[in-house]
């Protein structure tokens, strides 16, 4: 395994640990999710380039589209929560309330 693959896996692991440690604020959780998605994108692109599998070349772009949709929904949720409650704590999100 090359050093580039190890760095990308380490970036994913650091983002995952950050998501598990700093899950009290919505903004930090969203940033960690973005780091995870970007490391998955780079890993998928490198894997497809190394394997010369041209049929799957659209997969990283589709992953990037879903990451952009996730970021837009996350930021709209952040704006809604901060306008409603005044903070961005994840504890304020309760699925039993409308």
From Swiss-Prot:
Mode of membrane association: Multi-pass membrane protein
GO aspect biological process, one term: ATP synthesis coupled electron transport
InterPro entries in UniProt: NADH_UbQ_OxRdtase_chain4L/K (IPR001133), NUOK/Mnh_C1-like (IPR039428)
Catalyzed reactions: a ubiquinone + NADH + 5 H(+)(in) = a ubiquinol + NAD(+) + 4 H(+)(out)
Highest taxon of source: Eukaryota
Cellular compartments annotated: Mitochondrion inner membrane
Family recorded in the similarity comment: Belongs to the complex I subunit 4L family.
Protein name (record): NADH-ubiquinone oxidoreductase chain 4L
Annotated source species: Bos mutus grunniens
Higher taxonomy: Eukaryota, Metazoa, Chordata, Craniata, Vertebrata
Annotated gene: MT-ND4L
């Amino acid at each position: 395994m090359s050093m580039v693959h190890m760095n990308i896996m380490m970036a994913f692991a650091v983002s995952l640990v950050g998501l598990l440690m700093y899950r009290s604020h919505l903004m930090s959780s969203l940033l960690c999710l973005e780091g995870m998605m970007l490391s998955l994108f780079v890993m998928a692109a490198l894997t497809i380039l190394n394997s010369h599998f041209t049929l799957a070349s659209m997969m990283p772009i589709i992953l990037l589209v879903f990451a952009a949709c996730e970021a837009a929904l996350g930021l709209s949720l952040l704006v809604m929560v901060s306008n409603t409650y005044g903070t961005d704590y994840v504890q304020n999100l309760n699925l039993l309330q409308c």
